[in-house]
Amino acid sequence: MTSIYTSDLKNHRRAPPPPNGAAGSGSGSGSGSGSGSGSLANIVTSSNSLGVTANQTKPIQLNINSSKRQSGWVHVKDDGIFTSFRWNKRFMVINDKTLNFYKQEPYSSDGNSNSNTPDLSFPLYLINNINLKPNSGYSKTSQSFEIVPKNNNKSILISVKTNNDYLDWLDAFTTKCPLVQIGENNSGVSSSHPHLQIQHLTNGSLNGNSSSSPTSGLLSSSVLTGGNSGVSGPINFTHKVHVGFDPASGNFTGLPDTWKSLLQHSKITNEDWKKDPVAVIEVLEFYSDINGGNSAAGTPIGSPMINSKTNNNNNDPNNYSSTKNNVQEANLQEWVKPPAKSTVSQFKPSRAAPKPPTPYHLTQLNGSSHQHTSSSGSLPSSGNNNNNNSTNNNNTKNVSPLNNLMNKSELIPARRAPPPPTSGTSSDTYSNKNHQDRSGYEQQRQQRTDSSQQQQQQKQHQYQQKSQQQQQQPQQPLSSHQGGTSHIPKQVPPTLPSSGPPTQAASGKSMPSKIHPDLKIQQGTNNYIKSSGTDANQVDGDAKQFIKPFNLQSKKSQQQLASKQPSPPSSQQQQQKPMTSHGLMGTSHSVTKPLNPVNDPIKPLNLKSSKSKEALNETSGVSKTPSPTDKSNKPTAPASGPAVTKTAKQLKKERERLNDLQIIAKLKTVVNNQDPKPLFRIVEKAGQGASGNVYLAEMIKDNNRKIAIKQMDLDAQPRKELIINEILVMKDSQHKNIVNFLDSYLIGDNELWVIMEYMQGGSLTEIIENNDFKLNEKQIATICFETLKGLQHLHKKHIIHRDIKSDNVLLDAYGNVKITDFGFCAKLTDQRNKRATMVGTPYWMAPEVVKQKEYDEKVDVWSLGIMTIEMIEGEPPYLNEEPLKALYLIATNGTPKLKKPELLSNSIKKFLSICLCVDVRYRASTDELLEHSFIQHKSGKIEELAPLLEWKKQQQKHQQHKQETSDTGFA
C-alpha cells in the first residue's frame, strides 16, 4: 500500500468516503456487512496531482471500515479450568470499541445495535492477542480462535460454524484491532491459513504500487510472513512442549509417558483433574522425584532414591552403585596409571647435546623402557621433526621457545617440578669438556642443521647395524633414585635419522667433547618404537613435544656448567620453560645426571632467578591447552595431564567422584577406624531406617549389653554427606528424648556401623498395632509431650527432622519415648532459613512439602499431628489410597478429616487443628504446643505407658517358651 503523507497534500481535509458499491455485502449467515473490504474501497492519491510541498513524513491513518460491524452466531466458552466446559451459543457483534455477546440476535438499525444490554461486553483495547485454533471447536467442521486479554483474565474461546465465517471474523478483527497479533502460538498467522495470505495478494496493486486495503495492508505488516511485505519466515523456530490442561476435552496435554502411566494406574479421576489440575501436576512432579533418580544440590537422598530424576536406569540402587563404583575405580586407576612405555621410549635427541635430568616420578618407567632396546628400527618422522626443530631453533634464537611450542599446538599441562637426581661421575667427566668447547659446539650445531637431511638414510642404516652392539655394551650405574635401570652404555650408539650430526661411532665427524654420555641411554631406548608397530603419524603428543624442549634445554644446560655461574639471561630462562612443562608431564628421557658439579646437584632445575620462576608459572598456566595428538594417548597419561574438552555431564561426574572421596576422608575423621566385628555380636535384624538396616546386637566386652547397630552400605548411598550429617546431628543432639548415639565405625571404605542404644519397646507403630489401636487420650498426650520435647531440642538448634512418624518414635522397656532416624534431617542457617527439598514419607508430609514450596521447622509439627491421628485411628489419613492419590489429597484437601470426631475431646481436636493448619503462619510451633491445654492437662508420667508394652513382654515369653520346647525336643 502506498503511504500517504501530509506533505503530499495541498489542501488538508478529510478524505472523501468510499463509493457505496465498494462496501462488501453482508453475509446472510451472519458474516456481517463489514466482512468484505475490497480493493475498490482503497483510496489511491496520486502524488503528481497533489504535489510535494513539505518534508514532513507523518502518515495519515485511513480507517475506512471503522464504522462497519461484523456480527453473527457463534459458540463461546471461557478458557478457565474451574468453569463449565459446555459451549454456549451467543450472537457476537464487533463494533469500533467493544466485542459484545447477546443471548438473542439484537435488532439492528443503521449498523447500530438497538437490542437489550449485551450478555458480555469485551473492550477491544483489552485484547492482547488472538490465537487461531483451526479444525477445532463446537463441532467437527467448526473453526475456533481464542481471544487472550491483557489483564490476565480468562481467555474466551469462540467457535465459528463455517470456514467462510471464520475468515470473515478474522478480517473484522484485523480491521478493528490492527495492533493485535493474530496467529497460532502467539506468533502471528502462519501459512496454514491461506486466506490471510490470499487477502494480501488479491487486494491487488495499482500502477505497479502495492496499494491494498487497510485490512490487507495491516495483515502484510503485522501478520504475514514472506510475500510483498519483505518479512522473512521465522528463523531457528522451536516448539517447546509443556504440560497443560485442555478444558475442552478435560485431559492433560504434553504429559510425559511416565506421567501418563502413573495417571492411568492411579485412582485420580477426571473429576479430580478438572477440580484442581494444578495440584495433579504438582503431585506428579513430586511423586516422580521421590521415586526417580534426580538428585539436586542440597537435597538429601537418604531414603530410597529420594530426589532423583525420573530415570528407569537409576531406579535400581544396586545398578546405580555398581555403575558409580566402576566409574570411580576407573578414575582412580587413571590417576595412578603410568605413562605408556612407548611414550617414554619414542624420543630421540635432535643433536648431540647434554640431557636434562629425569623427573623423579618417571625414573622407574624409564628403566623399564630401557630394557626394550633390543628391537631395531626407527621412526622416519622423528628425523623430520628434529630437523624442523633444529632449523627453527637456529633461525629464531631470540624468539621465546614457548611461542614456538604454542604455534605447534604441542604444549602439555605441567605439574610442579620434581627434585632432580643426584649427580653421577660421568657428569663430572664431561662437564668440563663441554664448558671448554661451548663456542665450538655452537658453530658445529649450524653444520649439523645443514647436513641433517642428507645424512638421514645413512644414520638409519648405521644405527640398525649397531643396535645389537648397544645391547652388549657395559653399563654404568645410574642415580640412586632411578629404580628400573642400574647401568647405562658407555659408548654412544648412532642417533636416529634426525637433524643431529653423526655420532662418534657412526660418522667421520668427530665430536667427543660435545656429546654428553647420558645421551646414550635415550638413543638406545628408541629401538622399542618400531618393534611396537607405532606409526609415524600416530606418535604420541608427548613424543613430538619433547623434541623441542630437549633441544632448547641443551644450551641452557651447558651454560650451567659452573656451580657459581650467574643466572642465565632472560632468553635462556624462557628456554627453560618448555623443558619444565615437559618434564613435569612425565615424558622425559632416562637421563639422570645433572650437568653441575657433584657438590651442587640441584642447580639444573633450581638455579633460577625470580623471573625464571614466574616463567615456570606462566608455562604451567598456558600449557593447559592439550595438543591434538594428546587426545589419542590420553588414557596413558596421568590424570593431571592434558585436559581433554569434557562435557558438563563428565565434569559433574568428576566433581561427584572427587566429592565422594572427600566425604570418605571426612567420614574417617568422624568415625572410629577400629574393626567393630570383634566387639559386637549380631543377634537379629530389628528394623530398617532411611539409610540402612538396624540390627540388635550385644556388646561382648560389656556383659552382653544390648545395643542397636545401624549398618549402611556407603556404595548404595547416593548422598554420602547425609551419613556424616546424621552422625554429627546425633553426636550433637544428646537428649533424653533422642536415641542416644554411642559410636560409629568405618569398615573399609564402604561399610559403616552406627552404634546406638537399644529401645526394647520397639516403634510406636508396633505399639499401636499390638494394642488393637486402643490408646487413650492420656497415653496419646504423654507420647506427644515426650516427642515434642525432643523436637523442641532439635528446633532450638535449627534442625528439622523431616521424617516424624510412628516408625521413627521408639519406646524402651520403661516407657521412655525417643526420636530416631536422622537420615533426612537438615540444619537451617541465617543464610538459608527455609528448605524446599522433597523428603520424608508421603502420608506424613505437610502440604507445602508436596507442593514443593519452601518450609521450615513447622513441617515436623504437621507430621506430629498426622502421628497423633495414627494413635487415634490406627493409621494416617489416606493410607488406603495409593501414593499418588494420597499426595493429591494432601495437596488439595488441606487439613484431613477425622473419621469419628464425636468420640474425641475438644482439647485434642484443638490440638490437632493447630498442628494441621495448612497456612504455616498459623501453625503452632513446638514451644506453643508444649503450652497447649491438651499437653498440659492430659499428659502423664512415662510409667503410665508401661501397659502399652505388655504385648512385648508376652511376645518375649512366648519366644523363650518356644525356644525351650524346640531345644527339649531336639535333645
Swiss-Prot record:
Protein name: Serine/threonine-protein kinase CLA4
Composition-biased stretches (Pro residues): 491-500
Leading EC class: transferase
SMART domains found in the cross-reference section: PBD, PH, S_TKc
Biased amino acid composition, Polar residues: 423-433, 617-630
Active site: 803
Record-stated family: Belongs to the protein kinase superfamily. STE Ser/Thr protein kinase family. STE20 subfamily.
Gene behind the chain: CLA4
Domain of life: Eukaryota
Bias-annotated ranges (Gly residues): 23-37
Disulphide connectivity of cysteines: none
All copies of domain Protein kinase, residue ranges: 680-935
Binding site for ATP: 686-694, 710
Biased composition regions of type Low complexity, renumbered to the chain: 307-326, 365-404, 449-482, 554-578
Protein source organism: Candida albicans (Yeast)
Annotated EC: 2.7.11.1
Keywords (A to Z) from UniProt: ATP-binding, Kinase, Nucleotide-binding, Serine/threonine-protein kinase, Transferase, Virulence
TM regions (residue ranges): none
PANTHER family xref list: SERINE/THREONINE-PROTEIN KINASE SAMKA-RELATED-RELATED, SERINE_THREONINE-PROTEIN KINASE SAMKA-RELATED
Reaction(s) catalysed by this chain's protein: L-seryl-[protein] + ATP = O-phospho-L-seryl-[protein] + ADP + H(+); L-threonyl-[protein] + ATP = O-phospho-L-threonyl-[protein] + ADP + H(+)
MF-aspect GO terms: ATP binding; protein serine kinase activity; protein serine/threonine kinase activity
